[in-house]
Regions:
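Sequence signature of WD/YWTD-type beta-propeller architectures
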Residues: 3-5, 13-19, 27-30, 36-45, ...
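Hydrophobic "lid"/C-terminal helical patch
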Residues: 22
Length: 369
């Protein structure tokens, strides 16, 4: 079946205006513009039932067959030649973790998984077998720590002096030099964890599905924040005053020890990822509805919400560049990474991600100038 590509007259121009309006509202704190209708246009193709999703700037979504065929961005580069902003990437695959330099050169650290950058990108915390290791981006190991149970999701504190990680069904903390390993709690759901900036305070999800805020050095300074559904992701604003929790159908915004102070409920749409911008003002999030995913932008403390990019299939995860001017979107179904620039709309697409990084590769972090 031939795949048809439709766009309504003037639609891309209207999309560009929306991008500028949303961006300006956050950067200049202008009043919210009149809400526009961005629902895709349904068009009939001869001899077949074909849905063509409308352009949502700066990309497009094409539903050209009953199988929701996915076509990525045109003019995509066949490989990642360089990053569009200062910094380095971490990507994970079943073969190990990839360290991608600013010039596009990359190194595979075989056998590692669950990787995270340290502050300033000097080290990587990662799991190798039954060991938690701290290593340089060139693979040189500085320390290792063996533990029973499945190790996962290590995360550095803001100053690099603490590393939190899961071992089996417990949450543990070790000093940044590999000493002083200790149990923090067993009342935890292994998965999301996030350090508050400028503090040794950790946010995690307890067995009941609520969020615990715990100072790992002063154990009597704890708080419990109730949620509507167990979050799958936590992220702090850079000033440490607010954090977000990504629930199955919502993004909730909380003050540093509760309560809820904002957020978005997206109804039946599935929320798959969200990230706060480096300046702490904006939230980029991905929602999926009816086989179509949309990257959207909103304010941490309210303001307009607008689409940035939409496409058929799955957007796996997102990340901000260290300078906050680019968003990296993993368009899993199209086998592409998209670097999306703000405030001037621009998309740089890279194809063949599975061939270059592995069939199950994912973005783990974009760190440090």
């Amino acid at each position: 079946m031939k795949h048809l590509d439709y766009s309504a007259p003037g639609e891309r121009e209207a999309g560009e205006r929306t991008w500028e309006v949303v961006r300006a509202a956050f950067e200049e704190r202008l009043p919210s513009p009149r809400k526009r209708d961005w629902r895709p246009f349904a068009l009939a193709a001869a001899a077949a039932v074909v849905l063509a999703a409308a352009f949502s700037p700066p990309g497009n979504a094409v539903f050209g067959s009953l199988r929701d065929a996915v076509r990525g961005e045109r003019n995509a580069k066949p490989a990642l030649a360089s990053l569009p902003a200062p910094g380095r990437l971490l990507a994970e695959s079943s073969a190990g973790i990839w360290v991608v330099q600013n010039d596009g050169s990359k190194r595979l650290l075989t056998g590692y998984r669950d990787a995270a950058w340290s502050p300033h990108g000097l080290y990587v915390a990662a799991v190798h077998g039954n060991e938690l290791r701290a290593l340089e981006p060139n693979g040189r190991v500085h320390w290792s720590l063996g533990r029973t149970g499945r190790l996962r999701n290590p995360r550095w504190s803001f100053d690099g002096f603490r590393v939190a990680y899961f071992a089996g069904r417990s949450l543990r903390v070790v000093n940044g030099d590999g000493t002083g390993d200790r149990l923090l709690t067993r009342d935890v759901r292994p998965g999301p964890v996030a350090w508050q900036p400028n503090a040794h305070t950790l946010a995690y999800v307890n067995r009941a599905g609520d969020i615990e805020i715990s100072n790992v050095d002063k154990r009597n300074r704890n708080a419990t924040v109730q949620t509507r559904a167990a979050p799958g992701q936590l992220d702090w604003a850079s000033d440490g005053k607010t954090f977000i929790a990504v629930e199955p159908h919502a993004v909730e915004v909380f003050s540093q020890r509760g309560p809820r102070i904002g957020g978005l409920d997206r109804g039946i749409a599935q929320m798959s990822a969200a990230a706060i911008s480096p300046n702490g003002k904006r939230i980029a999030f991905v929602e999926t509805r009816g086989g179509r995913s949309t990257l959207q932008l909103t304010g941490v403390l309210g303001g307009p919400t607008g689409p940035i990019f939409a496409g058929a299939g799955t957007f796996a995860n997102i990340g901000w560049s260290p300078d906050g001017r680019w968003l990296l979107l993993d368009w899993r179904s199209a086998d592409q990474w998209l670097f999306i620039h703000s405030p001037v709309k621009k998309v740089l697409a890279v194809s063949n991600i599975r061939a270059n990084f592995g069939a199950d590769s994912r973005i783990a972090g974009w760190c440090c100038p």
